[in-house]
């Protein structure tokens, strides 16, 4: 997890990579702050979602980017935007003033994704978006991610340990082992057996299996 986190931080904020470049529209780019990354179109949905459970759906959608009308928040406008953007991803929010803690885990994930898209994400980093959810909620999130994928407007980095979810969503795969690239390839180059083996540890798993067999004999 630490290696994975460092790679994310190189992309989304001020961590400088030891080697290689981050290219945005073909231009080598570095970020001094997470805000710089966001302005350049890097949207991140964190594993903890960065949501405030006691605040409303709308306040979470606009957290830190509220729309003002004179000296007051323009809640009517923000409520309408929240409803519209959530509806685009298949979630009907009847009352955007309700605490976000009343929504399901899958709906909260969808809100975090919709928020990133609304505020201009060109690259969407999803950090284990299904890991803490039940099966039904996992399916909700996968449908949402697939909807975004089919827009063909946003690149998605989908970080997961679930081979089935990777197969459903991925067009191209990169397998990391302790911060190093173990393998990569397009969807048509990696079948399900190879996908499963690489995600399970590949050569290290085979070595462990051999060790167990030798121990048992």
Language model regions located:
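Conserved ABC transporter NBD signature motif
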Residues: 20-29, 38-40
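Helical segment within the ABC ATPase nucleotide-binding domain
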Residues: 139-151
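Catalytic Walker B motif of ABC-type/P-loop ATPase nucleotide-binding domains
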Residues: 124-127
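Single conserved hydrophobic/aromatic residue that forms the stacking wall/gate
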Residues: 1-7, 11
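A short, proline-enriched helix->beta-strand linker immediately N-terminal to the Walker B motif
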Residues: 117-122
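A short, surface-exposed alpha-helical micro-motif characterized by mixed small hydrophobic
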Residues: 166-168
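H-loop/switch region of ABC-family ATPase nucleotide-binding domains
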Residues: 160-161
């Amino acid at each position: 997890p630490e290696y994975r986190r460092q790679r994310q931080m190189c992309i989304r904020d001020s961590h400088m990579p030891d080697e290689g470049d981050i290219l945005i529209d073909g231009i080598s780019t570095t970020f001094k702050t997470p805000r710089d990354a966001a302005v350049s179109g890097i949207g991140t949905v964190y594993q903890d979602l960065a949501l405030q459970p006691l605040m409303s759906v709308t306040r979470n959608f606009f957290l830190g980017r509220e729309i003002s009308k004179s000296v007051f928040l323009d809640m009517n406008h923000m409520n309408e935007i929240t409803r519209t953007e959530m509806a685009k991803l298949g979630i009907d929010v009847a009352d955007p003033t309700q605490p976000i803690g009343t929504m399901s885990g899958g709906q909260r994930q969808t809100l975090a994704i919709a928020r990133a898209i609304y505020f201009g994400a060109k690259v969407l980093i999803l950090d284990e978006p299904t890991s803490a959810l039940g099966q039904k909620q996992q399916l909700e999130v996968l449908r949402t991610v697939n909807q975004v994928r089919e827009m063909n407007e946003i690149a998605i980095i989908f970080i997961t340990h679930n081979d089935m979810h990777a197969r459903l969503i991925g067009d191209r795969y990169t397998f990391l082992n302790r911060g190093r690239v173990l393998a990569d390839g397009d969807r048509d180059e990696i079948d399900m057996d190879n996908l499963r083996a690489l995600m399970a540890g590949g050569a290290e798993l085979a070595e462990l299996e051999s060790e167990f067999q030798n121990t048992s004999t």
